Amino acid sequence: MGIEDISAMKNGFIVVPFKLPDHKALPKSQEASLHFMFAKRHQSSNSNESDCLFLVNLPLLSNIEHMKKFVGQLCGKYDTVSHVEELLYNDEFGLHEVDLSALTSDLMSSTDVNEKRYTPRNTALLKFVDAASINNCWNALKKYSNLHAKHPNELFEWTYTTPSFTTFVNFYKPLDIDYLKEDIHTHMAIFEQREAQAQEDVQSSIVDEDGFTLVVGKNTKSLNSIRKKILNKNPLSKHENKAKPISNIDKKAKKDFYRFQVRERKKQEINQLLSKFKEDQERIKVMKAKRKFNPYT
């Protein structure tokens, strides 16, 4: 494809050409070798992805510093200002495509689609600090994309540090111990949180002997902690035979409605007074025998 054949695409992408530096691996020709990147305004309901450009076919080993340098050159050429915040979802080697934690346990996998972001390989989101920055950069890209036909010599040359053999060897070295500790701690915390939530969901559906289900509010401790706290006070309580609770009918029933109920109640009161009188008599006899009885004290 020649330089004159490049144009803006119908699907909204802008063609962003770069001149590649001379290298022995590139074919020798009078015209400079080009690399084409494609950019489009990103539209998403996710607030974290606002003010972003969707980039396709990034140059090899691109990072945030390379993109900031390019945006600085672009805005300087057209007398405008644009500030880049970060480069999102730039997973060139596909290191984050497989989540081993989700493969080992169902508790680590999430059914919420919004929690996991899927992006094609060799794509990224270039996030700007505000709407003015992305508008300035977008307008400058439109002007820059038209240079390939009339002024091909004004195209920017993509500069990057060629990785050495040592760089690739270090890339496949074992991960740092501190990084592994932090990553394991984070995943274990998430695992324990979801496991506790799953246990609470199971316990909340259990109905006790009285037909009640324990309900816990948002600001209350978990169900298991409440049950353990009750059980620790009296470990034998789980073996006790629970008395049948008084029904509403028994509570409302009058205890002195019939005559025999009144007689029984009076008889019980008299017997209690008589037993107490006899106990006092016996206690007075003992005190008199010990000569400690004083009726005026």
UniProtKB/Swiss-Prot annotation:
InterPro entries to which the protein is assigned, alphabetical: RRM_Rrp7, RRP7, RRP7_C
Superkingdom as given in the UniProt entry: Eukaryota
GO cellular component, one term: nucleolus
Transmembrane segments: none
GO molecular function, one term: rRNA binding
One of the GO BP terms on file: regulation of ribosomal protein gene transcription by RNA polymerase II
Protein name listed in UniProt: Ribosomal RNA-processing protein 7
Gene: RRP7
